[in-house]
Amino acid sequence: MKKLFSPILALFTCLILFASCGGSKSQEPKPKYIVQVSIGHWKAPTFSAEQIIARLDSVSRLIPIEKVIIGWSLDKEVYRKVGAYLHEHDINMLLWLPLFAETEEVLDNSPAVDLWGRLPAEYAAGGFRFNCPTDPQNLSNVIGLYDRCFSDCGFDGVFLDRVRTQSFVSGVGGVLNCGCPLCTEHFAAEGVDLAEVRAAWEKKGDEFLSVSHYDPVSGFEFADPLAADFFRAKGHIVSNSVAAVADSLHQRGLEVGLDLYAPFMAPFVGQDYEILSQHADFIKPMLYRMTFAPAGMGYEYDLLRKAIPGAKGYPDIQMDVAFLESQLEAMADCPCAKYPGIEINYRADIVPTSPEYVAESLAAVMRYHFDGLDLSWNIMEAPDAHIACLGK
């Protein structure tokens, strides 16, 4: 009897283990998707509600949509109609809202200036202007804009864009800012005298921003302690202002997402991941490897090296999967949900993506067990093939 029982018991145990393994595999988390709908800036929407709904309906047949980020036209009726459709399908709708830039059409905000009190080159040349990140009136103006123009449109949350200073798109003046009197006081409270920073730059030039060490995950270490202190303080100052706005939106019962630069470039624009991820429901780091325009990782890094050619220690960086994984590793410990932004739009000269590139990026993200992807940056114009590959 014992001899008969042992093989039966062994077989039964194996069946249980096999079923357990099979069940575990079937329960592997599937990626969730956030899509963005760009309908124009403050003017009449570039798409009708019916066009947007039809597009979202077709996309939802290819992939599961969890959230839709839409903005930032002032047409309330579009949001109400789209929101009604989304809520019928248990999809959250978030307002796409810029914080520190592109608000001059609707708000009287004070501008950001470099450490010499000058408007950075990007705005002087006709680009959009960035605003001071510490002026309390600037912050309250954006909250007031939401309350006046969007609070009755059915939004479940707000996705804050432009939560940074200028980048090297504006040259060195884009990152050595803001130097207004208010920001000067904030830097002083962080132990940084901006007069000393100005003097160091004027004396050392590009070498002031040299780095002594680079690690793909932990980022750059500045050779000059004053440069390190400046960017540490800048990250605290800008990110704490963003946190204050996020907290105010949370008090209104809203979910909050943040649009972030890739971790290796974030310190230059004042984004401290540790602070920001504690005040957001989710972050969308822009891990754009194929974008040859602002926010593209390679594009921004090339601008850095061109802006400070005399700085030492900046290595060649290949925008391959290994580098993508280093950026995913850098944000792995952030306590909020993580939806890396992967570009799915296509334009031969600016964003030459492919279905293979999109699928490759998804695979890397899911190896880190992140929540999913933010499909950037306008689902209305993305090729279907770049979406369908995600559902396979």
Short names for language-model regions:
Residues 41-45, 65-73, 124-143, 224-239, ...:
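The substrate-binding groove and active-site-proximal loops of carbohydrate-active enzymes
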Residues 191-349:
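Glycoside hydrolase catalytic-domain groove-lining segments
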Residues 45-78, 152-157, 282-286, 364-374:
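Catalytic domains of carbohydrate-active enzymes, especially glycoside hydrolases
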Residues 130-169, 173, 248, 273-276, ...:
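An active-site-proximal structural segment forming one wall of the substrate-binding cleft
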Residues 103-133, 171-228:
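Aromatic- and acidic-residue-enriched carbohydrate-binding clefts of CAZyme catalytic domains
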Residues 26-55, 343-345:
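Boundary/entry segment of secreted carbohydrate-active catalytic domains
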Residues 43-61, 137-149, 265-276, 351-366:
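Short, acidic/polar
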Residues 83, 94-153, 170, 239, ...:
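Active-site-adjacent "subsite" loops/lids of carbohydrate-active enzymes
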